[in-house]
Amino acid sequence: DYEFLKIIHCLKATGMQIKDIRKFILLVIQGDKTIDARLKLFQNQKNEVEKQIQQLEEALDTIKFKCWYYETAKVVGNTEFVDSIPDEELPEDLRVIRQKIRSLG
């Protein structure tokens, strides 16, 4: 049915491997005795998606910072000036991101 196909599409879209989607389908076919196994499968996938979201949010923060960085550099004509801006003069969100980026290097 359509709802079942949407669930499979959702699992695929979240990066679940085909073998695990196949496992889910087989569990559904086996009926209610596999409810616990299906729940575990979805809980595991939820955890994986939450990790992916966290990683994407961190990447997006870096991209936002670099957009600001190059927009500012374009206005002033160089990156040296932007690099010299003290952290305390940056808006808090940019300051936090800059500090995270610098702590990675």
Predicted regions and their residues:
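Arg/Lys-rich, alpha-helical DNA-contact motif
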Residues: 1-105
